[in-house]
């Protein structure tokens, strides 16, 4: 029931679907006259990038301040989370390299459909890698001086800043449907439905990567490291995985994840909470895979050769930028612009992915929840 006089809020998922359909219709009716709507779509990316840089900084620092992780358990959790993320990125990059886009789509035509140059290009460029290094150094310093009055005051200030930035990002995310409408109107107005095969290929690429990561890599970890039956694990994990797919958030799925780990999988409460509560700031395999795939995909669309060093940088940025953003709305979308821009790829490509991001966001959440549960089982094996 809703209070009298108040209309029920339309779910964001439904808003995004309606915006996609409405944008396609508007573009087909307006034709080239809808091109100006692409500028509005890129303005959304500009604002998101401006918020994302300080958000990543304070999120990493806050993780150091608030996380309580015993060293013995950290020696298992941290390397395992890093290994999972690297494997996820490697799968994404491998699939992206194996995909001959030019066979399916007229890439030269699509490059002309990207929204115009970003206003953010006229702002001072920020090196995300140095932002992350500064955040790590600040977090380590606060952790080393924990208990002192200045450290406590600064820690509280960081927590307050994180809450404010998350609220601002939440406000910006509410206008995602408008950005989706704008980019769909521009693209369909300029090329009809030529963009849809490209988006379909991208969705299949990411979905295939996540399926390989979950069904093959996690199965290997369960069988040979955690000494658990993968078939039984995935049967027990059905509830939290379906919940994550439905709500699109690993954090919102946390109560179901914990209940499944402790009651159905018989994982100890300590291991379950360490992996699913503390580890939720680290286990972002879905986001890492998505962003690595997106970066290589954009590079192919724009015919930009990414050398090995740049690909390693993509992986590093995706992993480090995801630390501490578990509770941020549309976390993968928030950090995507930073990763894309961090390796010199055109930010104009980001709005082109917006029409399918709502769908992939649910796959990201499901992969992240699976990661939490696999890590919990491995931790319990070495308890």
Model-predicted regions and their roles:
Residues 77-88, 200-217, 236-243, 312-325, ...:
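Small-residue-enriched core segments of transmembrane alpha-helices in multipass membrane transport
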Residues 38-46, 156-171, 232-243, 259-266, ...:
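Short amphipathic alpha-helical coupling elements at transmembrane boundaries
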Residues 71-77, 167-171, 264-280, 308-310, ...:
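Membrane-interface alpha-helices at helix entry/exit sites of multi-pass transporters
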Residues 47, 82, 86-90, 207, ...:
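Hydrophobic transmembrane alpha-helical segments of multi-pass transport and channel proteins
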Residues 1-60, 66:
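Anchoring transmembrane alpha helix of integral membrane proteins
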Residues 239-322, 376-377:
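Helix-loop-helix junctions within the multi-pass membrane cores of secondary transporters/permeases
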Residues 292-383:
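Transmembrane alpha-helical segments and their short flanking loops
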Residues 7-28, 45-48, 72-231:
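Signature of multi-pass transmembrane helix bundles
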């Amino acid at each position: 029931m809703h209070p009298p006089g108040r209309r029920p809020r339309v779910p964001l998922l439904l808003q995004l679907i309606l915006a996609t359909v409405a944008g396609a219709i508007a573009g087909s009716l307006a034709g080239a006259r809808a091109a100006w709507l692409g500028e509005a779509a890129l303005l959304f990316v500009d604002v998101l990038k401006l918020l994302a840089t300080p958000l990543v900084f304070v999120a990493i620092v806050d993780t150091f301040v608030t996380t309580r992780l015993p060293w013995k358990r950290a020696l298992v959790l941290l390397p395992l989370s890093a290994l999972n993320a690297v494997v996820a990125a490697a799968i994404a990059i491998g699939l992206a390299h194996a995909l001959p886009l030019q066979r399916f789509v007229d890439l030269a035509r699509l490059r002309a459909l990207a929204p115009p140059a970003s206003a953010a290009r006229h702002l001072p460029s920020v090196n995300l890698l140095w932002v992350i290094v500064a955040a790590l150094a600040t977090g380590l310093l606060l952790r080393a001086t924990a208990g002192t009055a200045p450290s406590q005051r600064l820690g509280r200030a960081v927590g307050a800043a994180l809450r404010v930035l998350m609220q601002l990002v939440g406000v910006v995310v509410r206008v995602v449907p408008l950005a989706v409408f704008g980019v769909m109107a521009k693209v369909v107005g300029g090329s009809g439905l030529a963009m849809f095969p490209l988006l379909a290929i991208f969705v299949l690429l990411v979905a295939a990567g996540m399926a390989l990561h979950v069904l093959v890599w996690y199965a290997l970890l369960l069988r040979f490291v955690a000494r658990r039956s993968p078939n039984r694990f995935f049967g027990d994990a059905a509830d939290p995985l379906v919940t994550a797919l439905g709500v699109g958030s690993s954090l919102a799925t946390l109560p179901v994840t914990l209940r499944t780990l402790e009651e159905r999988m018989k994982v100890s409460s300590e291991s379950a909470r360490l992996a699913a509560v503390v580890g939720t700031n680290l286990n972002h395999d879905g986001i890492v895979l998505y962003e690595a795939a997106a970066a290589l995909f954009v590079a192919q669309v724009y015919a930009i050769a990414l050398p090995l060093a740049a690909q390693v940088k993509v992986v590093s940025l995706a992993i480090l930028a995801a630390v501490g953003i578990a509770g941020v709305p549309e976390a993968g979308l928030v950090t995507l612009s930073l990763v894309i821009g961090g390796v010199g790829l055109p930010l104009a490509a980001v709005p082109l992915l917006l029409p399918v991001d709502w769908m992939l966001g649910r796959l990201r959440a499901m992969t992240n929840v699976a990661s939490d549960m696999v890590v919990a089982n491995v931790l319990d094996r070495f308890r």
